[in-house]
Amino acid sequence: MVDAMPENPAEEPTAASAAPNPEAVPDAVGQPEAPVKDRKVPGEYGASAITVLEGLEAVRKRPGMYIGSTGPRGLHHLVYEVVDNSVDEALAGYATGIDVTLQADGGVRVADDGRGIPVDLHPTEGRPTVEVVMTILHAGGKFGGGGYAVSGGLHGVGISVVNALSRRVDTEVRRQGHVWRMSFADGGVPQGELVKGEATDATGTVQTFYPDAEIFDSIEFDYETLRARFQQMAFLNKGLRITLTDERVQESNEVVDDEIAGEGAAGEDVAENGLAEDAEQEPQRRSVTYLYENGLLDYVQHLNSAKKVEYVHDDVIAFEAEDFSDGRSMAVEVAMQWTSAYSESVHTYANTINTHEGGTHEEGFRAALTSLVNRYAREKEILKPKEDNLSGEDIREGLTAVISVKLSEPQFEGQTKTKLGNSEARGFVSKAVTDHLGDWFERNPGPAKEIIRKAIMASHARLAARKARDNARRKSPLESFGMPGKLADCSSKDPERCEVYIVEGDSAGGSAKQGRNPETQAILPLRGKILNVERARLDKALGNAEIQSMITAFGTNIGEEFDISKLRYHKIVLMADADVDGQHITTLLLTVLFRYMRPLIEAGHVFLAQPPLYRIKWSNAPHDYVFSDEERDAAVEAGLAKGWRYPKDNGVQRYKGLGEMNYQELWDTTMDPEHRTLLQVTMEDAAAADAVFSMLMGEDVESRRTFIQQNAKDIRFLDV
């Protein structure tokens, strides 16, 4: 890969440039006329607000510790870190717009209209503060508490890590009446001093960075990945405008329009279908702008629009609350709506960070919701005295909700640091839900009763499902430990070593049983039809023998009774035919796992086997197994060039199914840990994954067709 410098790099600093004034007033000049928040965060954002903790020495040696990986996820994380800094300015009330540009030269440009990074000399470092922020890890306005009351990204930490992992970064600051410029190269080395440029009344920061190709597996940014992330950020920060523009030349067969109709707020000049207005003149350029004046209310409407469902109540319930007592800052926004769907769709955020592991804010929401609904149902005599209380799971059936809290000192826990641990958030959110939702119930008795009736129906279905499950257990002559009779279990009892293959069909299951390693590999063949749980209630889902077999074999149970510590296999491998039917079966299985056992996906326990599509039978060389038409053509061409021969009859065999392979072929190509390829199923964003499953497996045919047309071209980035 050629490591070309940008075509139009910023000019190098000159000796004649004026040095920053150490006595300069740190307050920003020319604040935005319409801040996102009515009340700006008190306190200065100057040199004294930047706290320094340590340098950048370890970042390039161990990038995974800072951005998670050097693959696509880590690469895109660089953009998020820079944008998070701009979002911090919006949270503080000083920024109204963020522009992100994917440049044709491979760089990413992020511009905001906030206060701009301070440029005066740092009191302890003796260098311009912007240089300190760019080159020293943990040098940011978050840590001392003076610059930000609420911080979503790690302000200063993020940009210094981006600098360390880039071959070039150009920083431009508009502050104190001037434009200031400074450039860095080769992992954060300053290319001269800070340059004071032309006068300006504007404020803000522009960061342009070029990822280092020696560190990342690829430096190609995916437009759709960034688009989805920025749309979510716009939802979470109402009134904040985020524009994403892609200036890279698109391939001629690539679908350019993004079918994002109606996403802009009223009065916002958002081009139809997400296209830039000059798309006719520049067909390779695509751009989309997000601006949501109603924030989470718009978010819930967006999530429900992907589902072909009826609404239990017409309007989205939305409310917010704040608490500034005891020297702390806390705020919560909630938007929620019940639909006719059979699954819940509850998403939580803390300081705009996706807390998909939940936490105290989600606990407070759930506890208050369950208590409130049961109390209301008793008071209005909808629940009879002898009837049991409704469970939280029953109440949340069909609920789409987004809970976003903002705290001055968030504490994150969990395996991926995406679980909120602040104990005070539990009571705060609980009280807000009790007060505001309780008031809504009193003012809307008709819809409130419909919500409770739906929960009662869900309760009846759950009890029927439990009864059917218990009856099935009593009737079945189950093997040891209550396992399904068709499960060929492994001998090892160590879950970390064990894996289970979910295989469709008896013939494939037979080959898999013969070819497996019986010590660590279990086989669960599925013989009947797998139910599409997206269109079925829990009782019907649990009445499906194949789904029941999976639940029993895994050992974790489902729903509120799910316990991942009881998982019997740390690898759950879905192995289906390499054709369209096999892909459909895989999608059905993934839908079951996502709806009823989502933590298995979140914890990285679910994998997709990759069986070959063709066998090339060489007469004078070992056989080749390939996985696509393109690989087949390339392998045949390469083999013939080497003088290899294959018979005229059946020289290239297309496998119609796993059952056509004998057990040795299945082991060699698909099950042998030394040679197989497994794709791990990951889930970056539960809300986006929810929308994908609703679209693919729901009843809205037109939405499904549109989604497939737009994403089939770039399926490698589809992250479910």
Curated annotation (Swiss-Prot):
Any GO BP: DNA topological change
Residue numbers spanned by region Disordered: 1-42
GO MF term list: ATP binding; DNA binding; DNA negative supercoiling activity; DNA topoisomerase type II (double strand cut, ATP-hydrolyzing) activity; metal ion binding
Nucleotide-binding found in the keyword field: yes
Cofactor remark from the record: Binds two Mg(2+) per subunit. The magnesium ions form salt bridges with both the protein and the DNA. Can also accept other divalent metal cations, such as Mn(2+) or Ca(2+).
PROSITE patterns: TOPOISOMERASE_II, TOPRIM
Main location: cytoplasm
EC number: 5.6.2.2
Transmembrane regions: none
InterPro entries recorded: DNA_gyrase_B_C, GyrB, HATPase_C_sf, Ribosomal_Su5_D2-typ_SF, Ribsml_uS5_D2-typ_fold_subgr, Topo_IIA, Topo_IIA-like_dom_sf, Topo_IIA_B
Pfam families (UniProt xref): DNA_gyraseB (PF00204), DNA_gyraseB_C (PF00986), HATPase_c (PF02518), Toprim (PF01751)
Gene Ontology CC entries for this record: chromosome; cytoplasm
Binding-site residues, Mg(2+) 1: 504, 577
Domain Toprim: 498-612
Known catalytic reactions: ATP-dependent breakage, passage and rejoining of double-stranded DNA
Site for Interaction with DNA, residues: 529, 532
Residues annotated as binding Mg(2+) 2: 577, 579
Function: A type II topoisomerase that negatively supercoils DNA in an ATP-dependent manner. About 140 bp of DNA wraps around gyrase in the presence or absence of ATP, when ATP is added negative supercoils are made.
Complex formation: Heterotetramer, composed of two GyrA and two GyrB chains. In the heterotetramer, GyrA contains the active site tyrosine that forms a transient covalent intermediate with the DNA, while GyrB binds cofactors and catalyzes ATP hydrolysis.
HAMAP family assigned to the protein according to its UniProt record, in alphabetical order: GyrB (MF_01898)
More about this protein: Few gyrases are as efficient as E.coli at forming negative supercoils. Not all organisms have 2 type II topoisomerases; in organisms with a single type II topoisomerase this enzyme also has to decatenate newly replicated chromosomes.
Family annotation (PANTHER family): DNA GYRASE SUBUNIT B, MITOCHONDRIAL (PTHR45866:SF1), DNA GYRASE/TOPOISOMERASE SUBUNIT B (PTHR45866)
UniProt protein name: DNA gyrase subunit B
Organism: Micrococcus luteus (strain ATCC 4698 / DSM 20030 / JCM 1464 / CCM 169 / CCUG 5858 / IAM 1056 / NBRC 3333 / NCIMB 9278 / NCTC 2665 / VKM Ac-2230) (Micrococcus lysodeikticus)
Taxonomy of the source species: Bacteria, Bacillati, Actinomycetota, Actinomycetes, Micrococcales
GN (gene name): gyrB
